[in-house]
């Protein structure tokens, strides 16, 4: 149950300002680490600002959702929601300058398949990236290297409560206890659209799954010109608790505002920021512990040396071919 979950205790926050502080702190910690390494100066223009990191996170989160939407075999919505939540949680406390979101997003999807028991083999998973066996092998190698890091950074809190189950529950409840609405299924399509849009915002980190699901249904009803206040007051028994009803309505309004004010990253801005990001991950600046460790094994002859062609980094272009 959500109310007894690690999600409620550790991953549901009080405000957007709190989320912004956590992200700014992750940005600051990386800057301090890079400066302490003697590789850059404190005000080096190579660094990304917190709002620039957020733009890149938005971009790669959208890429994650696109990847999941065309995945073969079809990926259940619960798996997609779990992967999305992992990605959001990871970059609350980590910087894209240290851990590249391109591989983190795939690792989130890979781990979500396991946790939600979506039976996909490793070759099947990377087979969704591109046809080149070398590209698939390289991607899988990186995913497996980052999987434990991801689990650790999630504090081993791997169970995610998504809004999809309560959403179906509310539809069943409407069919059973709210005869005023003859066909609740007419709300599904627009409500699904709302859930897809709100998944791109921080709502999953701020509100409960049932609040998100109920807001999706009521927003759909509102767009269809259907008034459902009596459902809240009668069926959900909020008539006698006006304070609770008022709070719920305020929460719903806040969620709708999140969706309205969401701005997708502009392609020209993303292109510039990706260049800065690649500079952060270049050999002379990269502080990625996993990369260093792998290089150390190679130096100690634990890992066979690879040809220059095999060492080429897996890139965004490899993902484009799968979409």
Curated annotation (Swiss-Prot):
Q: Pfam families annotated for this entry? A: Cyclin_C_2 (PF16899), Cyclin_N (PF00134)
Database matches in Gene3D superfamilies: Cyclin-like
Instruction: List GO terms (cellular component aspect).
Output: transcription factor TFIIH holo complex; transcription factor TFIIK complex
> Any idea where this protein resides?
Nucleus
Q: Which residues carry this modification: Phosphothreonine?
A: 315
Record GO biological process = DNA-templated transcription; regulation of transcription by RNA polymerase II
Residue ranges under compositional bias (Acidic residues)? 312-323
Please give one Gene Ontology molecular function term for this protein.
Answer: cyclin-dependent protein serine/threonine kinase regulator activity
**Is the keyword Protease assigned to this protein?**
no
Point out the signal peptide segment: none
Q: Which intervals carry biased composition (Basic and acidic residues)? A: 302-311
Q: Which domain of life is it from?
A: Eukaryota
Query: Which portions of the sequence form the region Disordered?
Result: 299-323
The chain residues annotated with the modification Phosphoserine are 5, 132, 322
Record keywords: Cell cycle, Cyclin, Nucleus, Phosphoprotein, Transcription, Transcription regulation
Enumerate the PANTHER family for this protein: CYCLIN
Q: Which family does it belong to?
A: Belongs to the cyclin family. Cyclin C subfamily.
Assembly and oligomerization: Associates primarily with CDK7 and MAT1 to form the CAK complex. CAK can further associate with the core-TFIIH to form the TFIIH basal transcription factor.
Q: What is the role of this chain?
A: Regulates CDK7, the catalytic subunit of the CDK-activating kinase (CAK) enzymatic complex. CAK activates the cyclin-associated kinases CDK1, CDK2, CDK4 and CDK6 by threonine phosphorylation. CAK complexed to the core-TFIIH basal transcription factor activates RNA polymerase II by serine phosphorylation of the repetitive C-terminal domain (CTD) of its large subunit (POLR2A), allowing its escape from the promoter and elongation of the transcripts. Involved in cell cycle control and in RNA transcription by RNA polymerase II. Its expression and activity are constant throughout the cell cycle.
Protein name, entry field: Cyclin-H
Organism from which the protein derives: Macaca fascicularis
Classification from the root reads:
Eukaryota, Metazoa, Chordata, Craniata, Vertebrata
């Amino acid at each position: 149950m959500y109310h007894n979950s690690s999600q409620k205790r550790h991953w549901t926050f009080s405000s957007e300002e709190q989320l912004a502080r956590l992200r700014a702190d992750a940005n600051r910690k990386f800057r301090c680490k890079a400066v302490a390494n003697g590789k850059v100066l404190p005000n080096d223009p190579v660094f990304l600002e917190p709002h620039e990191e957020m733009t890149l996170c938005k971009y790669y989160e959208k890429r994650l959702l696109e990847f999941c939407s065309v995945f073969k075999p079809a990926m259940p919505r619960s798996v997609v929601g779990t992967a999305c939540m992992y990605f959001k949680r990871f970059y609350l406390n980590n910087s894209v300058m240290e851990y590249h979101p391109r591989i983190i997003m795939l690792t989130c999807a890979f781990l979500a398949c396991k946790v939600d028991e979506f039976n996909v083999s490793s070759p099947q998973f990377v087979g969704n990236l591109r046809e080149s066996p070398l590209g698939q092998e390289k991607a899988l190698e990186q995913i497996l290297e980052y999987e434990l890091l991801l689990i650790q950074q999630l504090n081993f809190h791997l169970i995610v409560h998504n809004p999809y189950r309560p959403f179906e529950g509310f539809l069943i409840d409407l069919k059973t206890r709210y005869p005023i609405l003859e066909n609740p299924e007419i709300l599904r399509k627009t409500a699904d659209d709302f859930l897809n849009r709100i998944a791109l915002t921080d709502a999953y980190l701020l509100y409960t799954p049932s609040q998100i699901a109920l807001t999706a249904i009521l927003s759909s009803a509102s767009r269809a010109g259907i008034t459902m206040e009596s459902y809240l007051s009668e069926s959900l028994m909020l008539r006698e608790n006006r304070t609770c009803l008022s709070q719920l309505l305020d929460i719903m309004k806040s969620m709708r505002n999140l969706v309205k004010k969401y701005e997708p990253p502009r392609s020209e801005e993303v292109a510039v920021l990706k260049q800065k990001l690649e500079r952060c991950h270049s050999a002379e600046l990269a502080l990625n512990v996993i990369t260093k460790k792998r290089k150390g094994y190679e130096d100690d002859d634990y890992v066979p040396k690879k040809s220059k062609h095999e060492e080429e980094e897996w890139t965004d272009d490899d993902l484009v071919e799968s979409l």
